[in-house]
């Protein structure tokens, strides 16, 4: 297939937005120049392991970059890691991931694709499952693959190195993960592979295996791991600091309002379709002293419309939030209250006491029983109710005490 492309400089401007690491820019430009000259689209690979059913905004960052390549005329190749998911990516883990069955990964993959369709046109993608080439491998094939790397090389990975130094188990099958991901690149003859910065080791393994197979090494293009609502840890469902693609417009808007001001520009850049020029204007306005809340509300609306909501739904979500929080019901400058994430869920009375919103457990129980405790405006009446709080939620004790949840 041949086609006309926009100029290399025009493509680079689009493709480099939000990129934080690249191996290498020179190679990407060379591949684009050859693509323009020959009319052959680059094959741009993104692999996802369907280890869960629902996507957060954090998952959309590499998906949005894949969309950029597709809109520049290139062939997006989405690898459903139904086989690698049964191993579990050890990246950033202090312990081995639980292994999933093939039935579980198949069901998760279907849900993933349904949600990914909110980010890009999946009908334009070449969708492959790595069980196509990994499942038929014989044991001798696996041994030959294992011979492509060394234990010393694997221990260069920070997560493996840390576990080794702490005496935590590292299972042999975990060493295979980067080799399996690299084999995917060989199988689909990837020109470019996308991933988060935490995937660099795995992406580079693909380059090594492609060289060994006589292929031109892929360019490795990495996007950031964006912080969640707490502004500290990466966005994660397990931490509760996330905005999900399956959230309602009201939930999306409300959660956006809970982010620290320092994340406003980051979220505009990586999670919305707002033009870069407008983002720069917003950044300059905040630097000049304009109220960040104005732009946080704009961000909330933009997130809703970017992921399938209508302008009307975004407007109504803002109106409902304003009615609850801004018209004298809740102050905008709510102090943070720190709660230990490891102790959640926590009984309501202990939440009040630990957050410093009640002087004692007995006073906390009395306040709750009298109807004086709310979480995001919803009354809690049982002092023993187990609360699985998330970052950004607003606690109110009595008439005037407020706290915004931060988990540590």
UniProtKB/Swiss-Prot annotation:
Position of sequence motif 'KMSKS' region: 234-238
GO biological process: one example: tyrosyl-tRNA aminoacylation
Keyword Chaperone attributed: no
SMART domains (alphabetical): S4 (SM00363)
InterPro entries, per database record: aa-tRNA-synth_I_CS, aa-tRNA-synth_Ic, Rossmann-like_a/b/a_fold, S4_RNA-bd, S4_RNA-bd_sf, Tyr-tRNA-ligase, Tyr-tRNA-ligase_bac-type, Tyr-tRNA-ligase_bac_2
CDD domains for the chain: S4 (cd00165), TyrRS_core (cd00805)
HAMAP family documented for this protein: Tyr_tRNA_synth_type2
Protein name: Tyrosine--tRNA ligase
Gene that specifies this protein: tyrS
């Amino acid at each position: 297939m041949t086609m006309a492309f926009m100029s290399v400089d025009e493509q680079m401007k689009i493709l480099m937005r939000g990129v934080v690491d690249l191996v290498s820019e020179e190679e990407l430009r060379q591949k684009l120049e050859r693509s323009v000259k020959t009319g052959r689209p680059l094959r741009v690979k993104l692999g996802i392991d369907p280890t869960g059913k629902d996507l957060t905004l954090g998952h959309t960052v590499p998906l949005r970059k894949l969309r950029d390549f597709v809109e520049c005329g290139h062939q997006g190749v989405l690898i459903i890691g139904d086989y690698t998911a049964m191993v579990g990516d050890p990246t950033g883990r202090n312990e081995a991931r639980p292994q999933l069955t093939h039935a579980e990964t198949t069901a998760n993959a279907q849900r993933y694709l349904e949600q990914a369709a909110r980010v890009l046109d999946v009908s334009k993608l070449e969708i492959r499952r790595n069980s196509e080439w990994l499942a038929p491998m014989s044991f001798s094939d696996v041994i030959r693959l294992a011979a492509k790397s060394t234990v010393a090389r694997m221990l260069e990975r920070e997560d493996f190195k840390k576990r080794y130094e702490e005496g935590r188990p590292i299972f042999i099958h975990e060493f295979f993960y980067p080799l399996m991901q690299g084999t995917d690149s060989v199988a689909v003859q990837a020109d470019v592979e996308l991933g988060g910065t935490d995937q660099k080791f795995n992406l580079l393994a693909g380059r090594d295996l492609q060289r060994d197979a006589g292929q031109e090494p892929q360019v490795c293009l990495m996007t950031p791991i964006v912080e969640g609502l707490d502004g500290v840890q990466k966005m994660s469902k397990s931490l509760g600091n996330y905005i999900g693609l399956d959230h309602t417009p009201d939930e999306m808007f409300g959660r956006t309002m809970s982010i620290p001001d320092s994340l406003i520009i980051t979220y505009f850049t990586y999670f919305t379709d707002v033009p870069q020029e407008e983002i720069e204007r917003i950044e300059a306005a905040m630097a000049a002293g304009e109220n960040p809340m104005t732009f946080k509300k704009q961000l909330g609306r933009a997130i809703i419309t970017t992921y399938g909501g209508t302008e009307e739904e975004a407007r109504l979500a803002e109106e409902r939030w304003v009615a609850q929080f801004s018209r004298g019901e809740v102050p905008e400058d709510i102090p943070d209250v720190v709660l230990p994430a490891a102790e959640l869920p926590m009984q309501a009375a202990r939440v009040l006491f630990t957050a410093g919103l009640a002087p004692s457990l007995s006073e906390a129980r009395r306040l709750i029983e009298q109807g004086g405790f709310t979480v995001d405006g919803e009354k809690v009446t049982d002092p023993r109710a187990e609360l699985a709080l998330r970052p950004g939620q607003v606690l109110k004790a009595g008439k005037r005490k407020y706290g915004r949840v931060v988990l540590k």
